[in-house]
């Protein structure tokens, strides 16, 4: 399946998945032809993130507005790990089981920052749910003026105890999402067969990881997230992603005896904190697992965090899986021309339309 340049940079017509000609990108074939089987990827990723089960202990309070019902509360994903949750749902729903969309924020965000999107989804008939990722929002643990997320990642990097290793860079929040689905699936107002997920940037990467492995997620729309960590590292394009947590990378470079952040210490940093990210847990590998469920990948042309050549590898890998499953009608991608790393209004519209179509 050949994905040519013009296809990537041409705006999609409505929500009809892009038609792709036969073949596969040569770069994808060469770099990812020996990817582990989807079953192995799922098994290995689940094992990596496994931790002792705990009671969810959910608690919520409700507030009714003129048009939506808002619930604020929490559940526990681990014995001492409280996950704050924000839920918007249509007032008119009553006791009806609702389709659900989980919305994950990006670096520097929190669940409150997703409220406009939650409201919009609720007005369209969905229950919409956001959480604070690890060390964000109500889960910040650093003193005022510090970046709790970066501090936690730095601490995890410097942790000498391999048995008790945190993974605050993506992986721990992915585990929280799985437990969130555990909780939501028990609610009488949720249709467990109609659960979707979207995320922006960091949240989009977490969406790819969580949804690819968890078959309870029926529809997914990762935004400004499709990429290849392997390609970025090998082609010296890791800087955009690294700058989102730059101080942690600076500390890692210093700890390794380097005067600056470089490819070698970035690789060591990723290897410890997001093991497998340039191999079986890279986006082009994990994205295959979502087929044949409906998937829409939304990227921008000038995104330095998710360089387009790496994104193309992810697109091609997904397309190959969907073609093999005879499900190309359920796969779509779009690249917004001349846009940097941001969720554009047009892509937000496309995301909601995708859920309305498939969920």
Where are the predicted features?
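Active-site glycine-rich loops that stabilize anionic/oxyanionic intermediates
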Residues: 79, 104-109
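Short beta-strand/loop motif that positions the catalytic acidic residue
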Residues: 297-299
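C-terminal catalytic histidine-bearing segment of alpha/beta-hydrolase fold enzymes
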Residues: 315-359
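Mobile cap/lid helix-loop segments that gate and shape the active-site cleft of serine hydrolases
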Residues: 219-286, 307, 311-315, 323-328
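N-terminal cap/lid segment of alpha/beta-hydrolase-fold proteins
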Residues: 50-95
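Primarily recognizes the serine-hydrolase "nucleophile elbow" in alpha/beta-hydrolase
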Residues: 178-244, 278
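Short beta-strand element of the alpha/beta-hydrolase
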Residues: 85, 96-106
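Cap/lid segment of the alpha/beta-hydrolase catalytic domain
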Residues: 96, 107-175, 229-236
């Amino acid at each position: 399946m050949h994905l040519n340049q013009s296809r990537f940079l041409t705006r999609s017509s409505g929500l009809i998945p892009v038609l792709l000609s036969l073949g596969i990108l040569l770069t994808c074939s060469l770099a990812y032809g020996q990817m582990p089987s989807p079953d192995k990827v799922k098994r290995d990723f689940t094992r990596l993130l496994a931790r002792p089960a705990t009671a969810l202990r959910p608690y919520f309070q409700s507030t009714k507005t003129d048009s939506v019902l808002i619930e604020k509360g929490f559940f526990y994903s681990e014995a001492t790990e409280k996950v704050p949750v924000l839920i918007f749902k249509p007032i008119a729903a009553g006791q009806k089981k609702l389709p659900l969309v989980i919305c994950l924020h990006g670096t520097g965000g929190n669940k409150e920052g997703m409220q406009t999107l939650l409201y919009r989804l609720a007005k369209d008939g969905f229950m919409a749910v956001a959480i604070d990722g690890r060390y964000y929002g109500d889960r910040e643990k650093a003193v005022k003026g510090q970046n709790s997320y970066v501090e936690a990642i730095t601490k995890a990097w410097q942790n000498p105890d391999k048995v008790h290793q945190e993974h605050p860079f993506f992986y721990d929040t992915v585990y929280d999402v799985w437990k969130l689905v555990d909780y939501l699936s028990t609610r009488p107002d949720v249709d467990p067969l109609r659960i979707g997920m979207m995320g922006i940037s960091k949240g989009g990467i977490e969406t790819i990881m969580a949804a690819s492995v968890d078959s309870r997620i029926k529809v997914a729309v990762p935004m400004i997230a499709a990429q290849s960590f392997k390609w970025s590292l090998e082609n010296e394009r890791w800087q955009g992603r690294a700058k989102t947590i730059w101080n942690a990378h600076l500390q890692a470079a210093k700890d390794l005896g380097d005067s600056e952040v470089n490819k070698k210490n970035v690789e060591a940093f990723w290897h410890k904190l997001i093991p497998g990210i340039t191999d079986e847990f890279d986006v082009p590998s994990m994205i295959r697992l979502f087929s044949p469920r409906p998937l829409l990948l939304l990227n921008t042309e000038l995104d330095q965090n998710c360089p387009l050549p790496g994104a193309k590898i992810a697109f091609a890998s997904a397309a190959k899986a969907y073609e093999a499953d005879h499900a190309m009608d359920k796969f779509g991608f779009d690249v917004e021309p001349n846009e940097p790393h941001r969720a554009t209004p047009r892509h937000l519209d496309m995301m909601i339309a995708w859920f309305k179509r498939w969920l």
